[in-house]
Amino acid sequence: VDNPVIYVAIIVAVIVGAMFLNRGLRRSVSKSGSRYGRRTTDDRVNGILAELAATIVIHAPEPAAREVLDRVVLQQPRKFSLLDDGGYGIRFVEADDAVVRLVDDAEGTRMQVVRTTERLGMPQNLEFWRELRSRVTSGAEAQAISVADGPQHSFVRHDGNPVYWEITHESS
């Protein structure tokens, strides 16, 4: 087998085979990476929504609960805002990226997120919501008002500009 044409043909076949194998391998790896990324993002979004769905019940009438919440919001104007419609905003970029409302509850007044804006591919405002719940709990307890965890609710996603998540169902 002293013919160099055979060696050249084998080398060309290996190069062409490697090109086709490389494309298929790249495509397969890309699909696997995309699936993993979507799964990871979905898990993070579900975790964030579960925590944003957590409510607290302030064992006081709405005016007393509003007084506690107003005081907390006014102390942190860069994080929280009073909205014209009586709700409260949690700021990520805009003053109302998440909207918090006080709702009558059988045990007093429930504080809950009713809408949150999606930025950077997922709902934001989780840290500020945690802080708001903590500060309201401390403020209420300082006035001898008890606070308890309230019912969870769920959200539905609305596409648009911007994308937002809105409360759909309150569970007891």
What are these regions (language model features)?
Residues 1-38:
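N-terminal signal-anchor transmembrane alpha helix of single-pass membrane proteins
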Residues 24-93:
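N-terminal topogenic membrane-targeting module
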Residues 85-172:
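Cytosol-/stroma-facing membrane-proximal "stalk/adaptor" domains immediately downstream
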Residues 9, 13, 18, 50-54, ...:
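A sequence-composition feature that detects small, non-aromatic residues
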Residues 4, 61-63, 77, 123, ...:
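Proline-rich intrinsically disordered, low-complexity coils
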